[in-house]
Amino acid sequence: LTGAFTKPVANNILGALCEQKGIKVTTNWTVDSVEADRAVISSVTGDEIPYDLLVSIPPNLGQEFLIESEVSDVTDFIDTDKELLKSKKFENMYIIGDATNVPASKAGSVAHFEADVIAQNLMADIEGTDNYYRFDGHTNCFIVTGFEKASLIDFSYAVEPLPGMFPLPGVGPFELLGESHINYWGKLMFKWVYYNLMLKGHELPFEPNMYLAGKDTSLLRSK
């Protein structure tokens, strides 16, 4: 990564937050090895960083059996049309969640929004129409920042995370790319929402595709 986030607006805001909290962000750095006895990690270029507590996340890959079934790409994820969420090799196969190779986050919100799109497209197939919905890469995610505060990002394939209010434009109650106690409690509350509302099929005020209402789009125009 080139910063705290992959897109400029969020990178500037989250990068400043890291600096405020005394967190050093080391960019363009790929781990090559870990020396536990010295408590250092080394990069592929030979640079070293000492650590107190190391939390390492390995590269994500799909399952090997997908290669054998000839539905995957070179990373073992299923080769997926990023809008229709269909296999590029098998017309009657839909893919959802972490199994896809669409350029979106491997987040639970992505799978949820994909499910809404796929449900509509399955109905179109059953009814024999071409009234397909198209997934725009909609993703949102809480980021816990400490001391019972959190931030929130909401973005898509085409639109990067922007400041604003979510899910109700201008009302919220959650603040996009802002650090607040309400965001933190929203994250904690989501567990109850997931088990008691989402899994039971209740309607939620979250559209499968991202909307710009309530977001500071002037930051896009000024780029």
Residue ranges and their predicted role:
Residues 4, 134-151:
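Flavin (FAD/FMN) cofactor-binding core of flavoprotein oxidoreductases
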Residues 38, 47-116, 123-124:
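FAD-site-proximal beta/loop scaffold in flavoenzymes
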Residues 110-117, 149-155:
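Short, electropositive alpha-helical surface patch
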Residues 111-137, 143:
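Internal hydrophobic alpha-helix adjacent to the cofactor/substrate pocket in enzyme cavities
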